[in-house]
Amino acid sequence: MTLQEQIMKALHVQPVIDPKAEIRKRVDFLKDYVKKTGAKGFVLGISGGQDSTLAGRLAQLAVEEIRNEGGNATFIAVRLPYKVQKDEDDAQLALQFIQADQSVAFDIASTVDAFSNQYENLLDESLTDFNKGNVKARIRMVTQYAIGGQKGLLVIGTDHAAEAVTGFFTKFGDGGADLLPLTGLTKRQGRALLQELGADERLYLKMPTADLLDEKPGQADETELGITYDQLDDYLEGKTVPADVAEKIEKRYTVSEHKRQVPASMFDDWWK
């Protein structure tokens, strides 16, 4: 088995999917998991990007089906901007599409800036822009878990195969969640699910960005990665990609393995 095939298997990627069937499987997963845990529903941060839009709509469909079947579950969508978000219109469009039971908004700027200032005062150095970006992601995680803990809700994560293979998420930030309904999907497969669900194409054709950097607001994921999502998707779907692209992907996969594992102990061997 080639490394490419090993990665596809590890990340549960199917080269070809049926979007309607995938929606059904993922909604059922959300329903089954919330029932098994005894939780009261879900909470998820909504950015206006493809991934949170898809996960949010799946979550809302799941809680509606639970209620229609005589159960009780709710979904809270959370806006978590840092000051004024450049693509706020997209976030509002996503909320209109998702139709969450409840939507709330937290501006994380005061918390992030207060921490950054205290860090600088105590350690006599400023956080790097990259590190501050990770603080933003982790404050967003803290906010979602505060809501979830208060109301008995599970935190949904938006990680999918194209992010997982590169480790393109913040450890214990957007990587911190209770369940991951998008696991195994490539970026283009996620788009196909949103198309099937009837989303406005603006929500899945827009340029993907983590938008965590003050110095490079709205920087494209592909710029930061040095790899396009089409290349990532082709690789993950078992297609042939240029040798240098495959090498980049496989290197990122190897060095980011710790992000896909629970914290290491001396009894684990995955890191050796």
From Swiss-Prot:
It comes from Bacillus anthracis. One of its GO terms (cellular component) is cytoplasm. This is NH(3)-dependent NAD(+) synthetase. The lineage of its organism: Bacteria, Bacillati, Bacillota, Bacilli, Bacillales. Belongs to the NAD synthetase family. Pathway: Cofactor biosynthesis; NAD(+) biosynthesis; NAD(+) from deamido-NAD(+) (ammonia route): step 1/1. ATP binds at residues 45-52, 158, 187, 209. Catalyzes the ATP-dependent amidation of deamido-NAD to form NAD. Uses ammonia as a nitrogen source. Deamido-NAD(+) binds at residues 138, 171, 178, 258-259. Its EC number is 6.3.1.5.
